Amino acid sequence: MARKALIEKAKKHPKFSSRAYTRCELCGRPHSVLRKYKICRICFRNLAHEGKIPGVKKASW
């Protein structure tokens, strides 16, 4: 329940711009969020493995 409240709080426009912070749009995780995709590293990895993010593939060299 607390996580849902924090997600809703993060969606609101803050009074001061410095108070804004990124959260994962899928799970609400506040840390390790990739700004370009607006999702956390864990969700990014899962979606990349499923092939749901175009242009992303596992690196190998």
UniProtKB/Swiss-Prot annotation:
GO biological process: translation
Tagged with keyword Ribosomal protein: yes
Matches recorded under InterPro entries: Ribosomal_uS14, Ribosomal_uS14_bact, Ribosomal_uS14_sf
GO cellular component terms given for this protein: cytoplasm; small ribosomal subunit
Pfam families assigned to the protein according to its UniProt record, in alphabetical order: Ribosomal_S14 (PF00253)
Chain sites annotated for binding Zn(2+): 24, 27, 40, 43
Quaternary organization: Part of the 30S ribosomal subunit. Contacts proteins S3 and S10.
Assigned protein family: Belongs to the universal ribosomal protein uS14 family. Zinc-binding uS14 subfamily.
Protein name: Small ribosomal subunit protein uS14
Organism: Mycoplasmopsis synoviae (strain 53)
